[in-house]
Amino acid sequence: MPVTLAKTISKIQFIPNNTNAQLVKEMYEYLKSNGVSERHQHNALKVMIPFANYLGPTTTFFDIKSKEQILAFLDTKKKNEEEDTEKKWITTWNSYLVRIKYFFRWLYNQRGKNADAIPWTEWQTPSFVQIKYKKTKRLSPYSETEIWDRDELLTIVKY
């Protein structure tokens, strides 16, 4: 049975650092008040709660000042070649990075401000979160002849 948003929200109270727990709650409230889908809210919480737990009781999100601190957490998502021959962990790693970047962009640009203060498209990404995504080297399951080019797509989709 899949975990519900309500169940994930209930896990916020178990974050070992009260400051981090409060920040995760505030981010959730921000997402909810801006009409973000429940799935997006849930996915954001599913990343930030484990990240807060990883930081432990003595480190707050405000203490994060280097890429290495974030990379150490992200690298816990890596799997060895035997466990994941297709390197699907890279997709998870990148997904976690997207959500962590969003959180820190919210924290440093929007938290505690009027909802209309700065549009999210103009938020600045803190330098310590400017981490490049990993590229997968998985081979495509499609042959060269099975991939459509632009002209073929336009015959089906007329816009």
Show the residue positions of the predicted features.
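N-terminal DNA-binding module of tyrosine recombinases/phage integrases
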Residues: M1-S33
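N-terminal core-binding DNA-recognition domain of tyrosine recombinases/integrases
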Residues: T8, K25-P141
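A general boundary/transition motif marking the beginning of the first structured unit of a protein
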Residues: I15, R39, E144-T145
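Generic alpha-helical segment signature
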Residues: N17-A21, A44, S66-K67, E146-D149
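Amphipathic alpha-helical repeat elements characteristic of tetratricopeptide repeat
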Residues: A21-K25, L71, R150, L154
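Long, amphipathic, Lys/Arg-enriched alpha-helical "connector/arm" segment
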Residues: Q130-Y159
